[in-house]
Curated annotation (Swiss-Prot):
Active site (record annotation): 47, 119
Function: Digests double-stranded RNA. Involved in the processing of primary rRNA transcript to yield the immediate precursors to the large and small rRNAs (23S and 16S). Processes some mRNAs, and tRNAs when they are encoded in the rRNA operon. Processes pre-crRNA and tracrRNA of type II CRISPR loci if present in the organism.
Domain DRBM intervals: 157-228
Pfam family, one: dsrm
PROSITE patterns associated with the record: DS_RBD (PS50137), RNASE_3_1 (PS00517), RNASE_3_2 (PS50142)
Reactions performed catalytically: Endonucleolytic cleavage to 5'-phosphomonoester
Protein name: Ribonuclease 3
InterPro entries noted in UniProt: dsRBD_dom, RNase_III, RNase_III_dom, RNase_III_sf
Name of the top EC class for this enzyme: hydrolase
Record key words, sorted: Cytoplasm, Endonuclease, Hydrolase, Magnesium, Metal-binding, mRNA processing, Nuclease, RNA-binding, rRNA processing, rRNA-binding, tRNA processing
Residues annotated as domain RNase III: 3-130
Length: 232
């Protein structure tokens, strides 16, 4: 797929194509072709840029949310799962440059790679197009996804909800325990398996590529079991 044609759909006319090529180059491709660059540095910058512009977007568009709710919503917006979904929706995988081995294993469909590329492209667009171009890009991709989907309602703090439920029932001794850590060398990621224990008894299990995500999923699992009607 032609890079310039792809971005013209988003009213972005590329000035420095080298920046965009760098943002789309996975380190496996860089190693095979002996390149001195990959998307990692731009990914670093893109992560910081997203934090800033997502914060601003949420602040001005969701005036009724508290500081804590905005913080949780921002974390959910910039997490890997959300960026992956957006990248997949716009077929970003078709542009990513991968090494042979990574391509064979369908790296162009991997959540970690697509999320990283979205961050790197965000940085490239900011450097090439300045703020106006970046706002145009985010408005048609990430922010559009947030507005059009049920994202806000689906974004919940299950740990806080569980804590409040237990307090209302005067139950205590809540613990989150890491049961397992699986390391994925090809993605340089750790998949955590966490359990929720109440008074020494396991009530829920969750997985995630961060401890926080795994704990949230475990809390969600626990809540679904605690709220399930008991048969008489």
């Amino acid at each position: 797929m032609n890079i310039k044609n792809f971005f013209e759909k988003y009213n972005i006319k590329i000035n420095n194509e080298k920046l965009f090529n760098e943002a789309l180059t996975h380190n496996s491709y860089a190693n095979e072709h002996k390149l001195k660059y990959s998307y990692q540095r731009l990914e670093f910058l893109g992560d910081a840029i997203l934090q800033m512009y997502v914060s601003r977007f949420l602040f001005f568009n969701y005036s009724k949310l508290s500081e804590g709710e905005l913080t949780r919503l921002r974390a959910s917006t910039v997490r890997e799962e959300t960026l992956f979904r957006v990248a997949k929706d716009i077929n970003l995988g078709a542009l990513v440059k991968l090494g042979h081995g990574e391509y064979i294993t369908k790296g162009y469909e991997k959540p970690s790679i697509l999320a990283d590329v979205f961050e790197a492209l965000t940085a490239a667009i900011y450097l090439d197009q300045k703020e106006d171009g970046l706002v145009t890009w985010l408005g048609q991709t990430l922010f559009k996804y947030i507005k059009d989907s049920n994202f806000i309602n689906d974004t919940k703090d299950f740990k806080s909800e569980l804590q409040e439920l237990l307090q209302s029932e005067k139950r205590s001794d809540l613990k989150y325990i890491i049961e397992k850590e699986d390391f994925f060398a090809n993605e340089n990621k750790i998949l955590y398996t966490v359990s929720v224990n109440l008074n020494g008894q396991k009530f829920g299990v969750g997985k995630g590529f961060s401890k926080q995500e795994a704990e949230q999923n475990a809390a969600s699992d626990c809540l679904s079991k605690l709220k399930k009607p008991t048969s008489n």
